[in-house]
């Protein structure tokens, strides 16, 4: 239970790993509709997705697309049928065009052209959710706000080497390699550019966006001003983990994914001018300490 402007809010977290009354298969339409009808929520924060890192996406675009279409359609239908007028829906910077007309990309460019081929399933499902939110906002006057984070990292991440994102995948692998004395390998050339966002910072932005009623139906890119080559991210990790960076081997036979997907945070800074982002080196330190 949290308090905001003298209002008390109780948050219920749906988690498929916890077997309780709040365990719901979001791909099951009837289960989702029944659950929402039972609990009568006032707001929603829609974080759920079938999601993973580059190599999960490359190998599973079809099922990822199908699962996310079902999840998003079911959740949105349940919201509308049960009178939920306001909520936060999470997109991702990876849904932006692979070859945009300009950098940095802003919120108006999401549907400008095709996403990177490695991420088509997830990207198109999220783009469709974005369109659904916009259509509901127009026709039913809902206040469905779409937030667009860049690469997230932090405690409680998915560190499974089979389907994790960039930082948790590297951290897990380097930690194990250091313990066993095995060679440390990073995938690709290290040249792609990435913007990073500490997960706890994003959680604060979600909370503020939900309860700041001046924010109505916007799509908001969420990030700070920092951008790194992947090799620089690896260097930060090695410093944090007390590893000699010169020992890192780069497997350039592995895909780099999208080389650049820089997005514009102007609207974020306008809406949250006093927000203090966690510096990358501190976020990495906190993540490794938790791990």
Where do the model's predicted regions map?
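Adenosine-cofactor binding site in Rossmann-like domains, unifying the SAM/SAH pocket
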Residues: 2, 6-32
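SDR active-site strand-loop-helix element
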Residues: 14, 44-50, 87-93, 147-149
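NAD(P)H-binding glycine-rich loop region in Rossmannoid oxidoreductase-like domains
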Residues: 26-68, 81
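Conserved cofactor-binding/catalytic machinery of classical short-chain dehydrogenase/reductase
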Residues: 28, 43, 67-74, 86, ...
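Conserved Rossmann-fold NAD(P)-dependent oxidoreductase catalytic core, especially the SDR/UDP-sugar
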Residues: 73-119, 145
């Amino acid at each position: 239970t949290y308090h905001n402007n003298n209002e008390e809010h109780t948050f219920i977290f749906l988690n498929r790993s916890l077997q309780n009354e709040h365990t719901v298969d979001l791909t099951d339409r009837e289960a989702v509709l029944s659950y929402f009808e039972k609990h009568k929520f006032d707001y929603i924060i829609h974080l759920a997705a079938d999601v993973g890192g580059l190599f999960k996406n490359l190998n599973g675009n079809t099922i990822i697309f199908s699962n996310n279409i079902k999840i998003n359609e079911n959740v949105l239908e349940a919201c509308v049928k049960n009178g939920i007028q306001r909520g936060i829906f999470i997109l991702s910077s990876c849904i932006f065009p692979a070859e945009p007309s300009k950098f940095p990309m802003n919120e108006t460019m999401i549907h400008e052209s095709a996403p990177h081929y490695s991420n088509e399933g997830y990207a198109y499902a999220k783009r469709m959710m974005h369109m659904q939110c916009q259509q509901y906002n127009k026709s039913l006057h809902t206040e469905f706000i779409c937030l667009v984070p860049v690469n997230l990292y932090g405690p409680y991440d998915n560190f499974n080497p089979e389907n994790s994102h960039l930082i948790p995948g590297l951290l897990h692998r380097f930690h194990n390699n250091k313990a066993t004395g095995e060679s440390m390998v990073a995938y690709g050339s290290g040249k792609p550019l990435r913007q990073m966002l500490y997960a706890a910072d994003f959680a604060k932005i979600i909370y503020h966006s939900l309860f700041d009623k001046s924010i109505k139906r916007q799509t908001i890119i969420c990030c700070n001003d920092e951008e790194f080559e992947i090799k620089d991210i690896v260097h930060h990790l090695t410093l944090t983990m007390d590893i000699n960076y010169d020992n890192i081997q780069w497997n350039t036979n592995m895909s780099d994914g999208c080389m650049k997907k820089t997005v514009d945070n102007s609207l974020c800074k306008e809406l949250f001018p006093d927000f203090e982002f966690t510096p990358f080196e501190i976020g990495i330190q906190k993540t490794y300490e938790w791990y």
